[in-house]
């Protein structure tokens, strides 16, 4: 019943897209979608875009995470490829390889047939669930958040999330946008292992990145932090709690950004990391 109530505010195309993507995540389509994501498309994107120019730091900080622990991966957001590459790095970890879900704004991917096709084929259905900008679809956003909470309470699941809530297009990639409370709510209510990360060096243009990978420049640097210790909250959590934790996650990501900045200056000439905002 709640499913139908939440979907009622969506257009016919959005309802179809949601059901297709849910099938790839919760129906019998989940297994082939997982094989496609982990075995084909994510490694292919990583190999095409960054394999020859990627530097990874801090991955050893994750060695103590239990094999089946649910993981919330929180990162900065400069390009469409951020979570793709970070997810690719994690699935290569001997104990952390699992399907990753990347919640996405509904624009294009849930509103057009081409967007749905690209989402299904190019991500293996991992861009699920969707979030909507319009106020009349607020119930759907609550429903999507509850789907993520359920995933993050399930052993072996991983969700990638941007506390900033939207892509940071400013000229300074090291100054994050204000954190939105959604990431804090997921962390507090589900209590997963929260892994912060920072990545920089890419644009939003696929072929530009393919060519850059062949040239091995500019460098793409990814830094992982140790799991975040979450505060204990007695009773029901409130919006103020969610925002406070989201701010904490942003602080952890920003600290990794400072680490990335120092590493970048040590391994390469001064570059223009702000290029990723374009």
Indicate residue ranges for each PLM-predicted region.
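A generic local structural motif
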Residues: 41-42, 56-61, 89-90, 115, ...
């Amino acid at each position: 019943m709640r499913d139908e109530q939440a979907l009622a505010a969506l257009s016919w195309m959005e309802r179809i897209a949601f059901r297709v993507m849910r099938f790839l995540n919760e129906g019998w389509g989940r297994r082939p979608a997982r094989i496609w994501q982990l075995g084909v498309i994510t490694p292919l994107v990583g190999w095409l875009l960054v394999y020859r120019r990627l530097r990874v730091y801090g991955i050893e900080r994750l060695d103590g995470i239990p094999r089946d622990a649910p993981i919330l991966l929180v990162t900065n957001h400069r390009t469409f490829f951020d979570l793709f590459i970070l997810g690719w790095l994690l699935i290569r970890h001997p104990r952390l390889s699992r399907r990753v879900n990347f919640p996405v704004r509904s624009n294009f991917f849930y509103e057009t047939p081409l967007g749905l096709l690209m989402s299904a084929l190019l991500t293996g259905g991992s861009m699920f669930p969707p979030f909507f900008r319009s106020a009349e679809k607020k119930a759907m956003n609550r429903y999507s958040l509850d789907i993520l909470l359920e995933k993050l309470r399930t052993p072996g699941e991983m969700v990638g999330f941007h506390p900033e809530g939207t892509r940071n297009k400013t000229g300074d990639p090291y100054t994050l946008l204000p954190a939105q409370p959604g990431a804090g709510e997921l962390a507090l209510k589900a209590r997963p292992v929260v892994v912060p990360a920072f990545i920089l060096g890419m644009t939003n243009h696929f072929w530009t990145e393919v060519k850059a990978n062949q040239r091995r420049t500019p460098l793409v640097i990814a830094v992982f932090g140790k799991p975040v210790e979450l505060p204990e909250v007695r009773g029901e959590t409130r919006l103020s709690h969610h925002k406070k934790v989201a701010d904490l996650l942003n602080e952890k990501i920003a600290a990794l950004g400072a680490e990335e900045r120092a590493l970048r200056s040590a391994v390469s000439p001064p570059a223009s990391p702000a290029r990723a905002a374009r």
